[in-house]
Regions:
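Sec/Tat signal peptide C-region and signal peptidase I cleavage site
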Residues: 26-31
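Secondary-structure end/capping motifs
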Residues: 231-309
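Conserved C-terminal helix/tail region of periplasmic/extracytoplasmic solute-binding proteins
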Residues: 302-327
Length: 327
């Protein structure tokens, strides 16, 4: 009897060992690889793929555990990369200039093209009724050297007023800018157009300038990765970008569900989010690749923002080596 029990025990032990090996070899049984992602703004539509990918299980499909945190503009985002507190950052095209100044990162994807989702909004009692009324006015931006800062200067330049024809003040996150507008401390705010749509709905203001009508060749948003991360975890970079492309594909094919999911991030009403989806979805890149004309405009913007004294060789600031191979 004892011999039979011992034999049975050994069989059970062997079976358990086999099951353990099978479990370890099964995708999903292993702990997902952590990636830390910073957003220049926590609620921006173009950055919502992080949250949608998590909700739909797309990051899990690529064995990634994606954590994200919002920052108040590009400058703070770049500081986080220097401090090695994030692996990826979702920022603006002009933010590429900080790489030439020593931020230890590389641009790995161009995720949004012309700034279809960016606007300049004015208050309900504002004396500013037309483009020409903006000359000499003071508007808020997130930070100096940011996308919002450049858009104002570029619009002013196109109007023939020079880059400083519209005055700017840096106020950080969107709530602070909206509060300043309502208090009359600024004559306009440069944010995502959805903030302007919200002001319109509440009777507090309106969108005056849609920057996508004035800036055509551009990379509004890009994805950065720290040099340390691309060196130590190149496979995670590839998986993250492949997952991002899949999320964008989902968003394009599932309009109604995407709108509902984005409202959880933006905290905007569904009607406003619908308006933003229809406006902004076309600017989101399906292949994440860089466009020569857009890079030329970015190079010029870095000089105009006084981030760099001369236009850089943009090829030194980005790479496409981690993007999926074209079919």
């Amino acid at each position: 009897m004892n011999t039979a029990r011992k034999a049975f025990g050994r069989q059970c032990l062997r079976a358990a060992s086999v099951l353990a090996i099978v479990a370890l070899a099964t995708p999903g049984a292993l702990a997902a690889d952590l990636v830390r992602v910073g957003k220049a703004s926590a609620t921006t539509f173009a950055f919502a793929p992080i949250d949608i990918g998590k909700e739909k299980g797309i990051w899990a499909k690529y064995n990634l555990d994606v954590e994200s945190i919002g920052f108040g503009g590009d400058a703070r985002l770049q500081q986080a990369m220097v401090a090695d507190s994030i692996d990826f950052s979702l920022g603006s095209g002009p933010g590429m200039g900080f790489l030439a100044k020593g931020v230890p990162a590389v641009t790995v994807a161009a995720m949004a093209n012309e700034p279809l989702a960016m606007g300049l909004s004015v208050g309900k009692n504002s004396p500013i009724k037309s483009y020409d009324d903006l000359k000499g006015a003071t508007v808020s931006v997130s930070t100096g050297g940011s996308l919002t800062f450049w858009l104002v200067r570029e619009f002013s330049r196109q109007r023939g007023w020079g880059p400083a024809g519209i005055k700017t003040v840096s106020l950080g996150v969107n709530p602070a800018q909206v509060a300043a507008l309502k208090a009359g401390n600024v004559q306009g705010i440069v944010t995502s157009s959805s903030i302007g749509y919200m002001l319109e709905k509440n009777g507090d203001g309106r969108v005056l300038v849609e920057f996508g009508d004035h800036v055509k060749d551009f990379h509004t948003h890009v994805i950065f990765a720290t040099k340390k991360f691309v060196t130590t975890h190149p496979d995670r970079v590839k998986r993250f970008l492949a997952g991002w492309i899949e999320v964008i594909d989902f968003m394009a094919k599932n309009r109604e569900e995407t709108i509902k999911l984005v409202t959880l991030v933006s905290q905007l009403s569904e009607d406003i989010q619908t308006r933003e989806y229809d406006k902004a979805m076309p600017m989101l890149s399906r292949d994440l690749r860089f466009r020569p004309k857009a890079l030329d405009v970015l190079a010029r913007s870095l000089v105009e923002l006084e981030i760099l004294p001369t236009a850089p060789d943009m090829k030194t600031l980005y790479t496409e080596e981690f993007l999926p191979v074209r079919n």
